[in-house]
From Swiss-Prot:
Lineage of the species this protein comes from: Bacteria, Pseudomonadati, Pseudomonadota, Gammaproteobacteria, Enterobacterales
Protein name per Swiss-Prot or TrEMBL: Tryptophan synthase alpha chain
Stated family: Belongs to the TrpA family.
Function summary: The alpha subunit is responsible for the aldol cleavage of indoleglycerol phosphate to indole and glyceraldehyde 3-phosphate.
Quaternary structure and interacting proteins, as annotated: Tetramer of two alpha and two beta chains.
Gene Ontology molecular function, alphabetical: tryptophan synthase activity
Amino acid sequence: MERYENLFAQLKDRKEGAFVPFVTLGDPSVEQSLNIIDTLIEAGADALELGIPFSDPLADGPTIQEATLRAFAAGVTPTQCFEMLALIRQKHPTIPIGLLMYANLVFSKGIDEFYAQCEKVGVDSVLVADVPVEESAPFRQAALRYNVAPIFICPPNADDDLLRQIASYGRGYTYLLSRAGVTGAENRAALPLHHLVEKLQEYNAAPPLQGFGISSPEQVTGAIEAGAAGAISGSAIVKLIEKNVANPGQMLTELKAFVTAMKAATRA
């Protein structure tokens, strides 16, 4: 959790927002996935949001479902994902690493064992996408036991009660949803969410990062202008992986250019 605090403090000093890319671990293969993650970091990613392939990803649009299928086709297992996480942490000791998960993957290991393993490999946060705040107690309690930040999604229609709960239970950062629905770059992010950001700040929530449909530098700038601490981009990045599956070198070149442009927008 300290890695997030350190990151946001450093960014504040530099008057920058955070740019956080999302990819699925093991897409399109373990080896190329590790190359991709190195490239994202070299190009300026401030933190990582990583998915573990899961057979029924509810909140994911078609782009990220395809990423999951590619990882499955490469034979990637949750155990391998944790081995990858340990390697990433070894190589990049300071970058915050977050997991975006589904509850079944946590249950299959046992909640306590899952978070213990997260701590062991150096994961900083876990967002369990299909567990609402009111059912989150066993997850967030285990997370805090192992010094892992529980992340909560703040939807655009959140009422005051939900905002207070998110502020109270969340650590690390708050995942600010640009709009309701499934992920995807083709569903452009809606208007910036000034009122939510103000309320979250009033209740001392962890810094908000805006996600869902973030695919251009202008949207990153817009998120930061609305008061968000930064932006998360998933589908736009995964699309570049999909487009260049047959050409790994070109894939890394395009990913580097995209992340460089998105990170530059946090300094505007």
